[in-house]
Amino acid sequence: MDLQHWQAQFENWLKNHHQHQDAAHDVCHFRRVWATAQKLAADDDVDMLVILTACYFHDIVSLAKNHPQRQRSSILAAEETRRLLREEFEQFPAEKIEAVCHAIAAHSFSAQIAPLTTEAKIVQDADRLEALGAIGLARVFAVSGALGVALFDGEDPFAQHRPLDDKRYALDHFQTKLLKLPQTMQTARGKQLAQHNAHFLVEFMAKLSAELAGENEGVDHKVIDAFSSAG
């Protein structure tokens, strides 16, 4: 059975059993992560079925950002994937299940589980790249809006004189997590892409800063200077 067969099997199952997830964790997200993972894996001798499966099930359990057990999401997702592969996909190669589950458990930023295989490193990078760039920008404000989080602190949007708090202000999430992601990348290509996409977020911050100052045609170069080295 080839990868296209398994991808079709997974998508069909998810469309019937995973329909009510937010846009940051839906089937389209899984598909994008898989597309990115294929690019990251292009020059490596890796098990693509392990990567495909982990990409499609890494968020099969995804607790809300404000859930007290949020950091356990990837562990719970790995446990659920193990069950699903054994019970719902009986023809899936049993010898690959633990490698899939490790890649899923290790993908999460909050779980802090080190990826020990090349497959797990690729899945982690592919998922983290989704948090950067234009898609990442859209996701931040979509998720924050759903949680009732303010866009930014109008008095101090970049937290120059206050502690960062991304539970109150969506923009703070750029500094608490997103701009740090390039430093966590496991693959050379992943790091390169992460730095490129993080720069897009910095440019957004610079444009926002200019607009808040009443300047609608330029960007705040002080913001670019302050944050461009974050990755």
Curated annotation (Swiss-Prot):
Record SMART domains: HDc
Native source organism of the sequence:
Escherichia coli (strain K12)
Q: Identify the Pfam families for this entry.
A: HD (PF01966)
What PANTHER family does its record include? Answer: HD_PDEASE DOMAIN-CONTAINING PROTEIN, SUPERFAMILY HYDROLASE, PUTATIVE (AFU_ORTHOLOGUE AFUA_1G03035)-RELATED
Its name, as the record gives it, is Uncharacterized protein YedJ
User: Which NCBIfam families does the entry link to?
Assistant: PRK10119.1
What the entry lists under InterPro entries is as follows:
HD/PDEase_dom, HD_domain
Its domain of life?
Bacteria
Q: Tell me where in this chain the HD domain is found.
A: 26-132
